[in-house]
């Protein structure tokens, strides 16, 4: 009995990776397996040139499709019928695939691809053979090579022939784990989780750092950040979250620095602490959710002054995006409703009404003379707590008790 018993996975950008292609493909298979294996133990995984083939072995394809849609590195995928490389079997499978198509079907097209060159029939000949068979065994259906109701894709490979009629879009990008580690400054707002999402899309392994200032920021604010990190695990596996005690340093800055320079000095301190954590965790870069000109601390002048304190690259994935664009993505990845919960983070307390939009490095150095920078930064790094979030449901009660 013919049935859709495989999923054929395509990847786009990986095909351009030359000699490193094997490494990218291997990581993608590993990521797919780690996502699917716990819930679908009967799946089999086979990597062939330009494709990954999942054998369903009786598993329900619908929930598998939902999970594949969230794995970076996948360009698209299709449900497929696999048959042996025999013309009669291909004809029967093509007809079955058409008959199983949903909706009204009046026109079709065969699109055959002979990836296995020893197969004696060319792609164009296959189109004619299979198309003729489908026409002879259906009524009131015709061929339309330009805009068909159903396109029957046929791929002949060494392991068999795969017949498909639909295609589901993936997220694209690179497989998570192929681009090194990045430490994301996760504030709890709308922007930084979206920045994390785009970093994952470029294949980074993500860790996050959050600055917590109790009692000015409460435990609900901390839980909010944990929940945001958990949302990011849907796209990139586990996330290590580093919680930095920031109260004493923030109070110290508030006491010693003029209000219009507080934000600049605070951001410089955050960057110093982040660099310290990045070095301890072997992160190659720090990332923020900053967008150029959005607030006073995100002008080019501010960024130039704040960046002075680190030699670690600072990535800003959202730099050129409008707020509305960011909000749209936040809703798509399901972080928006968490981000807008009304719990203050450390950047909103002691918020001065007159922050400088063009602070200079000289001004920052002048006022940092009154701040015990090294001692406070080291204390914050040493007091940092770390938790591992493996999925939305993986923050156990014990972990939360330790966190709170």
Swiss-Prot record:
Pfam families: ThiI, ThiI_fer, THUMP. Pathway: Cofactor biosynthesis; thiamine diphosphate biosynthesis. One of its GO terms (biological process) is thiazole biosynthetic process. It is an enzyme of class 2 (transferase). ATP binds at residues 185-186, 210-211, 267, 289, 298. Keywords: ATP-binding, Cytoplasm, Nucleotide-binding, RNA-binding, Thiamine biosynthesis, Transferase, tRNA-binding. One of its GO terms (cellular component) is cytosol. Residues 62-167 form the THUMP domain. Gene3D superfamilies: 3.30.2130.30, HUPs. It is found in: Cytoplasm. GO terms for molecular function: ATP binding; CCA tRNA nucleotidyltransferase activity; tRNA binding; tRNA-uracil-4 sulfurtransferase activity. It catalyses: [ThiI sulfur-carrier protein]-S-sulfanyl-L-cysteine + a uridine in tRNA + 2 reduced [2Fe-2S]-[ferredoxin] + ATP + H(+) = [ThiI sulfur-carrier protein]-L-cysteine + a 4-thiouridine in tRNA + 2 oxidized [2Fe-2S]-[ferredoxin] + AMP + diphosphate; [ThiS sulfur-carrier protein]-C-terminal Gly-Gly-AMP + S-sulfanyl-L-cysteinyl-[cysteine desulfurase] + AH2 = [ThiS sulfur-carrier protein]-C-terminal-Gly-aminoethanethioate + L-cysteinyl-[cysteine desulfurase] + A + AMP + 2 H(+). Its EC number is 2.8.1.4. It comes from the Bacteria. NCBIfam families: tRNA uracil 4-sulfurtransferase ThiI. Catalyzes the ATP-dependent transfer of a sulfur to tRNA to produce 4-thiouridine in position 8 of tRNAs, which functions as a near-UV photosensor. Also catalyzes the transfer of sulfur to the sulfur carrier protein ThiS, forming ThiS-thiocarboxylate. This is a step in the synthesis of thiazole, in the thiamine biosynthesis pathway. The sulfur is donated as persulfide by IscS. Belongs to the ThiI family. This is Probable tRNA sulfurtransferase. The lineage of its organism: Bacteria, Bacillati, Bacillota, Bacilli, Bacillales. The gene is thiI.
């Amino acid at each position: 009995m013919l049935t859709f018993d495989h999923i054929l996975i395509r990847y786009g950008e990986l095909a351009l990776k030359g000699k490193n292609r094997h490494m990218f493909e291997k990581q993608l298979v590993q990521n797919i397996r780690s996502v699917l294996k716990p819930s679908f133990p009967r799946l089999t995984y086979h990597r062939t040139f330009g494709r990954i083939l999942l054998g369903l072995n009786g598993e329900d394809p619908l929930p598998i499709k939902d999970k594949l849609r969230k794995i970076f590195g996948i360009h698209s995928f299709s449900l497929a019928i696999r048959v042996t490389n025999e013309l009669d079997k291909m004809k029967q499978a093509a007809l079955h695939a058409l008959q199983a198509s949903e909706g009204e079907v009046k026109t079709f097209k065969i699109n055959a691809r002979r990836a296995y060159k020893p197969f004696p029939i060319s792609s164009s000949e296959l189109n004619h053979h299979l198309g003729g068979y489908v026409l002879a065994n259906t009524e009131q259906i015709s061929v339309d090579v330009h805009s068909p109701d159903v396109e029957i894709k046929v791929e002949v490979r060494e392991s068999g022939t795969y017949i498909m009629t639909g295609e589901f879009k993936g997220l694209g990008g690179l497989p998570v784990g192929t681009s090194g580690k990045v430490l994301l400054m996760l504030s709890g707002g709308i922007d930084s989780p979206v920045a994390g999402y785009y970093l994952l899309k470029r294949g980074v392994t993500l860790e996050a750092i959050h600055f917590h200032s109790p009692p000015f920021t409460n435990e609900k604010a901390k839980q909010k950040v944990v929940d945001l990190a958990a949302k990011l695990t849907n796209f990139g596996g586990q996330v290590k979250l580093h919680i930095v005690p920031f109260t004493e340093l923030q109070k110290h800055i508030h006491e010693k620095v003029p209000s219009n320079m507080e934000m600049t000095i605070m951001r410089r301190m955050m960057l110093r602490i982040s660099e310290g954590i990045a070095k301890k965790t072997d992160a190659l870069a720090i990332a923020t959710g900053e967008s150029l000109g959005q607030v006073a601390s995100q002008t080019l002048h501010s960024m130039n002054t704040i960046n002075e304190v680190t030699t670690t690259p600072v990535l800003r994935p959202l730099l050129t995006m409008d707020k509305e664009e960011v909000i749209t993505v936040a809703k798509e990845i399901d972080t928006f409703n968490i981000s807008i919960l009304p719990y203050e983070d450390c950047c909103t307390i002691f918020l001065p009404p007159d922050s400088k939009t063009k602070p200079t490095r000289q001004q920052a150095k002048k006022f940092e003379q009154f701040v015990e920078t090294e001692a406070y930064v080291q204390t914050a790094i040493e007091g940092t707590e770390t938790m591992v979030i493996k999925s939305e449901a993986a923050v156990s009660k014990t972990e939360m008790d330790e966190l709170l």
